[in-house]
Amino acid sequence: MREILHIQGGQCGNQIGSKFWEVVCDEHGIDPTGRYVGTSDLQLERVNVYYNEASCGRFVPRAVLMDLEPGTMDSVRTGPYGQIFRPDNFVFGQSGAGNNWAKGHYTEGAELIDSVLDVVRKEAENCDCLQGFQVCHSLGGGTGSGMGTLLISKIREEYPDRMMLTFSVFPSPKVSDTVVEPYNATLSVHQLVENADECMVLDNEALYDICFRTLKLTTPSFGDLNHLISATMSGVTCCLRFPGQLNSDLRKLAVNLIPFPRLHFFMVGFAPLTSRGSQQYRALTVPELTQQMWDAKNMMCAADPRHGRYLTASAMFRGKMSTKEVDEQMINVQNKNSSYFVEWIPNNVKSSVCDIPPRGLSMASTFIGNSTSIQEMFRRVSEQFTAMFRRKAFLHWYTGEGMDEMEFTEAESNMNDLVSEYQQYQDATADEEGDYEDEDEALHDE
């Protein structure tokens, strides 16, 4: 079986992560004590991807939970599914990172990292054929960003040939938790560009907008936002957990979505999103799902795909539907909006179909797009970074933990390079005489 090892770090990561486990447990019919109470054999067929079966027939998530302070962990433990996790897999410090990337990456986090790696190793040895890791974290704080990226680079050293997928919550443009977010995020992106294979980019403001505009929630809580994220996370991995007509795994996903190794930051979307009140008045159809999932308002990060072009995209449909109809709709989208797709990668939209829909829906779809417009997000963070860094504001918090200004400069230029790479491919045309003539073949159609 192709197992995935789930790691969640920091306050944000632990909250998203525990919500994700609620959704996955529900889909596989596993109750909060780890017992199977489902009704369909399909739920158990590939349950090993995310669960370990213990001797007494209980299912234990392949999850590692880490934080530099005990608070969030305690609330996960007392939460609805808190008892399902292996108690040894909670790894936490006492000091906290205080929203300081350097503390998470170099001082406090570095002291705790070995105990986390021990747990990761133990879980990895429990797998038949480990497919890869998925990490939930935010980039604005200290633990998820600093210690999260430290862990990713350590895992990269130890398991170089396994996929590394991250669900990274970026700081949002208008909603800010802490003033040093741009520093933490830039230092993290610097790491993610080098060490992660696929990053699903999320941000609170876009999620907030979806809750407010589409779901008609007047005062969305973090719980509501995390519910959206967990629906997407469940959708990304449903092909691995259930049988389907067109299957896909983390590596296939990467092969189809990443034309150039550094450009692995994806926008994600989910459909159908309807307000709770109007759900029963709508029949879902494949065209409707397709239309909604390509809608810019549906993207879970604050970048507008209409401002850039799609290098590649992937659509995962769930439920009983005809693959023929799915393919027709996908071709239809590409033909109608051809200007939004780069013409030098033909057939750049991949679709997969999984037979089992999420709880309470007859069909659903998850969208993952590699769009050049994501540079808007990096640009925004980079501008805020430069504004503060020019004055060396708040820098003493980082240098005090032993960091060097040089590292900031490097991270800044790496992020700016990333932005200009996206821009370069946005402007590129198929017939242009350029250095990347032979790179058109980089995306194989399976």
From Swiss-Prot:
Lineage: superkingdom: Eukaryota
Recorded coiled-coil stretches: none
Acidic residues biased stretches: 429-446
Residue sites binding Mg(2+) per the record: E69
GO biological process: microtubule-based process
Cellular compartments annotated: Cytoplasm, Cytoskeleton
InterPro entries (alphabetical): Beta-tubulin_BS (IPR013838), Beta_tubulin (IPR002453), Tub_FtsZ_C (IPR008280), Tubulin (IPR000217), Tubulin/FtsZ-like_C (IPR037103), Tubulin/FtsZ_2-layer-sand-dom (IPR018316), Tubulin/FtsZ_GTPase_sf (IPR036525), Tubulin_C (IPR023123)
Keywords: Cytoplasm, Cytoskeleton, GTP-binding, Magnesium, Metal-binding, Microtubule, Nucleotide-binding
Keyword Magnesium assigned: yes
Pfam families assigned: Tubulin, Tubulin_C
Region span, Disordered: 417-446
Entry GO CC: cytoplasm; microtubule
Segments of skewed composition (Polar residues): 417-426
Leader sequence residues: none
GO molecular function, one term: structural constituent of cytoskeleton
Residues given in the record as GTP binding sites: Q11, E69, S138, G142, T143, G144, N204, N226
Required co-factors: Mg(2+)
Family stated for the protein in its record: Belongs to the tubulin family.
Subunit structure: Dimer of alpha and beta chains. A typical microtubule is a hollow water-filled tube with an outer diameter of 25 nm and an inner diameter of 15 nM. Alpha-beta heterodimers associate head-to-tail to form protofilaments running lengthwise along the microtubule wall with the beta-tubulin subunit facing the microtubule plus end conferring a structural polarity. Microtubules usually have 13 protofilaments but different protofilament numbers can be found in some organisms and specialized cells.
Function: Tubulin is the major constituent of microtubules, a cylinder consisting of laterally associated linear protofilaments composed of alpha- and beta-tubulin heterodimers. Microtubules grow by the addition of GTP-tubulin dimers to the microtubule end, where a stabilizing cap forms. Below the cap, tubulin dimers are in GDP-bound state, owing to GTPase activity of alpha-tubulin.
Protein name: Tubulin beta-4 chain
Lineage: Eukaryota, Viridiplantae, Streptophyta, Embryophyta, Tracheophyta
